[in-house]
Amino acid sequence: MENLARRLDLCQEQLLELYEQNSKELQQHILHWKYIRYESAIYYTARQMGIKHLGHQVVPSLDVSKAKAHAAIEMQMCLESLQNTEYNVEPWTLQDTSQELWLAEPKKCFKKGGKTVEVRFDCNETNAMHYTLWTTVYVQVDDAWTKVKGQVDYKGLSYTVHGCTTYYVDFAKEAQTYGKTNRWTVIVGSHVICSPSTIEEHGLPIVETADARPPTTATDTPDAPATATTETVGPAQAPPRKRRRNGHLPITTTVGKSLGGEYVDTADRTRTPDPESNNGHRNCGGGSSTPIIQLEGEANCLKCFRYRLGKVSHLFCNSSTTWRWTTESRTEKNAIITLTYSSVQQRSDFLAIVKIPKTIKHSLGMLTLM
């Protein structure tokens, strides 16, 4: 027992050192999963011997240790095969090589640079869902890794390998769950992908995401056919967010020409963009804006969920206590928790990895301090 406890301490010390180093080298993340495998093997052996505590730590059940060891072996082997490619010189974070991201759609692929895509079902702004479009996807085909760009079109989110396109989010299936009319509008950055009738008339444009190119600006091309248009979204472009004020971001439809400083919504109304907005971010002079997610639900459910978020504390900056509105006219009993983020990108990564329970409603917003 003492021998197992000593080995467990050494293994966990190595894990803590790796967490503190916060390395961006792929080899270090291979070591991370190797030590997790060792840790699970020690727990498994201890449980087989009838030991339920090693030091101050509770020994998990055999099934839990076995499942965790299998997951660690899978991650270690995949990272070792990736290490033997030209992609080993790229920066890789602990989050990039996490099991949560590995199992997020598209599953069993490494991915980087998540961007938020808003889909308005029934073309209704109040009936919108957000999905993650990955800038870069690393796909393993026949024991070889291929680096491809994520794509979005009216059908869904996809990537293409050797001419074969794989959709990992199908908007038609999503519309069966969230919509009623089997119609939807896709918004990515400042681009809008329109209704099926428009797509059938003009063809199906694709918006690609670039992995290392600077963002490009769409220009008016009235003489060019819409089917020849391919828009590129640069990695520095902020993911879209729902605007609650009168101002709107300039939007460019993929089947038409850029409208410059105006935005045309699904009801063909023309609005002028907010003069304070700049590429999706508000420029407040002396103030600053912080991306937030507001969680609303039953108080105990929120507290339990906040406790579980401690395991992924690297995905957000701060969490508030539970609070409520005190307006006398409100009879709402639900409590609220506010999470803050260092950037819109971090918030997108949070939504891509963390599964929010159905009993908890969440809203995206910006907290501005003047």
From Swiss-Prot:
Ranges for region Transactivation domain: 1-200
Species in which this protein is naturally found: Human papillomavirus 40
Region DNA-binding domain: start-end pairs: 289-370
Post-translational modification: Phosphorylated.
Predominant place of localization: host cell
Pfam families reported in the protein's UniProt record: PPV_E2_C (PF00511), PPV_E2_N (PF00508)
Keywords from the named record: Activator, DNA replication, DNA-binding, Early protein, Host nucleus, Phosphoprotein, Repressor, Transcription, Transcription regulation
Gene Ontology terms for molecular function: DNA binding; DNA-binding transcription factor activity; nucleotide binding
The protein, known as: Regulatory protein E2
UniProt feature, compositional bias: Low complexity: 212-230
Subunit structure: Binds DNA as homodimer. Interacts with protein E1; this interaction greatly increases E1 DNA-binding activity. Interacts with protein L1; this interaction enhances E2-dependent replication and transcription activation. Interacts with protein L2; this interaction inhibits E2 transcriptional activity but not DNA replication function E2. Interacts with protein E7; this interaction inhibits E7 oncogenic activity. Interacts with host TAF1; this interaction modulates E2-dependent transcriptional regulation. Interacts with host BRD4; this interaction mediates E2 transcriptional activation function.
GO biological process, one term: DNA-templated transcription
Keyword Electron transport set for record: no
Known function: Plays a role in the initiation of viral DNA replication. A dimer of E2 interacts with a dimer of E1 in order to improve specificity of E1 DNA binding activity. Once the complex recognizes and binds DNA at specific sites, the E2 dimer is removed from DNA. E2 also regulates viral transcription through binding to the E2RE response element (5'-ACCNNNNNNGGT-3') present in multiple copies in the regulatory regions of the viral genome. Activates or represses transcription depending on E2RE's position with regards to proximal promoter elements including the TATA-box.
GO cellular component annotations of the record: host cell nucleus
Family recorded in the similarity comment: Belongs to the papillomaviridae E2 protein family.
Region (Disordered): 212-255, 268-287
InterPro entries: E2/EBNA1_C_sf, Nucleotide-bd_a/b_plait_sf, Papillomavirus_E2_C, PPV_E2_N, Reg_prot_E2, Regulatory_protein_E2_N, Regulatory_protein_E2_N_1, Regulatory_protein_E2_N_2
Localization annotation: Host nucleus
